[in-house]
């Protein structure tokens, strides 16, 4: 009954609880009215609050509105094969008072990805999520799959990715979801993934650069670069380069780059203010795992901003997001310090569904159509660090990334 639960039918709101003998109904065009069975009359105003309401958005995925022979509206849940006269959107009504000012944002840190997608149907949309076999990436992929999107889980370990696909299919057997191999630590693997993806001849409407590594001991990839830098930044940079033609053909399309608030606690320029490769991919003697992670997260925002500047004229936007503080996931398995900190902070952390919310919000919010080059935290735009806002550093990082790839593979494919 997962789809029914996600539709909101289990939710109640004590403030809007009706008196005995009253029933809440909706019209064909979404207006809420109230039936008083005791006095056999109807009215637009809630009998307790006096408010007028309407349902928000489309019906949840898998639902259809029909009318019976008496002209009464009813609803068919095709996923769970049930019929009801209760509009599933009634759990998400909004006040009919558009002129009343409000300072409350629609979503916040407690919002889940499923709540953001409630009532949305993404049939025909293709979503690619890297690192989607667990954690935030899995919740992002699952949320889209349960709302009709064709979702591709791009992961280093195909076996674990296939297990993640099975978990999604257990929730809804008709979900359109598949796994593909992508190792961001190997540039040739990124290239092979892009070739395999293009061979499918599908569109690409949302690309979520989610995969990442944290607290690794110093090491070099097969391409001769420090692992954290290549996995968290350069691999994603190359992936987007290879798929940018597909994104542009699929426009409007969106790229979401998962960064972190830790980007604020580092810098990647030398004393003269120039981008310094030795800070991005340091030798063993200068390596500190936490600093390497922070620098890669700064690269994420700079990359997202420059990507938006270059591709937005072609209908592709990009935004960077912070998923949440002290969220334990598989990327932290290498750090005993982080495990200890997480154990202490766990009562105050987000769930993985909440952690995926900002990513999903930036991927689907109608108010962000055509907008990008921004940084979001708790589904709200906020300013990143001053260095993350530097257009000069963003351009320099882009050019350096292109050179690093070209030096190893030759001219990038497209």
Swiss-Prot record:
Signals that turn on the gene: By hyaluronidase. Up-regulated in outer and inner nuclear layers during retinal degeneration.
Gene Ontology cellular component terms for the protein in this record: cytoplasm; cytosol; Golgi apparatus; lysosome; microvillus; mitochondrion; nucleus; plasma membrane
Motif Nuclear localization signal in this chain: 50-55
Keyword check for Transmembrane: no
Active site: 293 (proton acceptor)
Phenotype of null mutants: Indistinguishable from wild-type at birth, but die after three weeks due to metabolic syndrome characterized by serum hypoproteinemia, hypoalbuminemia, hypoglycemia, hypocalcemia, hypotriglyceridemia and hypocholesterolemia, growth retardation, decreased bone formation and increased bone resorption. In addition, spontaneous tumor development was observed.
Chief location of this protein within or outside the cell: cytoplasm
Region (Mediates targeting to the mitochondria): 209-273
Signal sequence bounds: none
Amino-acid positions noted as binding NADP(+) in the UniProt annotation, renumbered to this chain: 131-137
PTM annotation, UniProt: Phosphorylated upon genotoxic stress. Phosphorylation of Tyr-33 regulates interaction with TP53, TP73 and MAPK8. May also regulate proapoptotic activity. Phosphorylation by TNK2 is associated with polyubiquitination and degradation. Ubiquitinated when phosphorylated by TNK2, leading to its degradation.
Entry's EC annotation: 1.1.1.-
Modification Phosphoserine, positions: 14
Phosphotyrosine modifications at: 33, 287
Domain WW as annotated: residue spans: 16-49, 57-90
GO molecular function: enzyme binding; oxidoreductase activity
Residues bearing PTM Phosphothreonine: 12
Keyword Ubl conjugation attributed: yes
PANTHER family named among the record's database cross-references: RETINOL DEHYDROGENASE, WW DOMAIN-CONTAINING OXIDOREDUCTASE
Family indicated by similarity: Belongs to the short-chain dehydrogenases/reductases (SDR) family.
Record's subunit section: Interacts with TP53, p73/TP73 and MAPK8. Interacts with MAPT/TAU, RUNX2 and HYAL2. Forms a ternary complex with TP53 and MDM2. Interacts with ERBB4, LITAF and WBP1. Interacts with DVL1, DVL2 and DVL3. May interact with FAM189B and SCOTIN. Interacts with TNK2. Interacts with TMEM207. Interacts (via WW domain) with VOPP1.
Role played: Putative oxidoreductase. Acts as a tumor suppressor and plays a role in apoptosis. May function synergistically with p53/TP53 to control genotoxic stress-induced cell death. Plays a role in TGFB1 signaling and TGFB1-mediated cell death. Inhibits Wnt signaling, probably by sequestering DVL2 in the cytoplasm. May also play a role in tumor necrosis factor (TNF)-mediated cell death. Required for normal bone development.
Domain description: The WW 1 domain mediates interaction with TP73, TFAP2C, LITAF, WBP1 and probably TP53.
Protein name per UniProt: WW domain-containing oxidoreductase
Organism: Mus musculus (Mouse)
């Amino acid at each position: 009954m997962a789809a029914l639960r996600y539709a909101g039918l289990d939710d109640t709101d004590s403030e809007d609880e009706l008196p005995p003998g009253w029933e809440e109904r909706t019209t064909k065009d979404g207006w809420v009215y109230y039936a008083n069975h005791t006095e056999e009359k109807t009215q637009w105003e809630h009998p307790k609050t006096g408010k007028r309401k309407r349902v928000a958005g489309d019906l949840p995925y898998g639902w259809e509105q029909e009318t019976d022979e008496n002209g009464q509206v009813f609803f068919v849940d095709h996923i769970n094969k049930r019929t009801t006269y209760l509009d599933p959107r009634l759990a998400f009504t909004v006040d009919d008072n558009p002129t009343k000012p409000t300072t409350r944002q629609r979503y916040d840190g407690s919002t889940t990805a499923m709540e953001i997608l409630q009532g949305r149907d993404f049939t025909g949309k293709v979503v690619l999520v890297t690192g989607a076999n667990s954690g935030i990436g899995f919740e992002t992929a699952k949320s889209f799959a349960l709302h009709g999107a064709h979702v591709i889980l791009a992961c280093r370990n195909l076996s674990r990715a296939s297990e993640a696909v099975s978990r999604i299919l257990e929730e809804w057997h008709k979900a359109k979801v598949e796994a593909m191999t992508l190792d961001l630590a190997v540039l040739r693997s990124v290239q092979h993934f892009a070739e395999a993806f293009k061979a499918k001849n599908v569109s690409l409407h949302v690309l979520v650069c989610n995969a990442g590594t944290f607290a690794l001991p110093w090491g070099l990839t097969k391409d001769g670069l420090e692992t954290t830098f290549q996995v968290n930044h350069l691999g994603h940079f190359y992936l987007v380069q290879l798929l940018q033609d597909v994104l542009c053909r699929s426009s409007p399309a969106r790229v979401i780059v998962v960064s972190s608030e830790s980007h604020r606690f580092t810098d990647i320029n030398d004393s003269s203010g120039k981008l310094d490769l030795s800070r991005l991919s340091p030798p063993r003697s200068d390596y500190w795992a936490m600093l390497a992670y922070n620098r890669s997260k700064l690269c994420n925002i700079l990359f997202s901003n420059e990507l938006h500047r270059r591709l937005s004229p072609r209908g592709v936007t990009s935004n960077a997001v912070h998923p949440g503080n002290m969220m334990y996931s598989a990327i932290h398995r290498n750090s005993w310090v982080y495990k200890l900190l997480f154990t202490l902070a766990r009562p105050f952390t987000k769930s993985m569904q909440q952690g995926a919310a900002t990513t999903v919000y930036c991927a689907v919010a109608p108010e962000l159509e055509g907008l990008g080059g921004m940084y979001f935290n708790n589904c709200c735009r906020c300013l990143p660090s001053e260095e993350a806002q530097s257009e000069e550093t963003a351009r320099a990082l882009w050019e350096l990334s292109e050179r690093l790839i070209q030096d190893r593979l030759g001219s990038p494919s497209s």
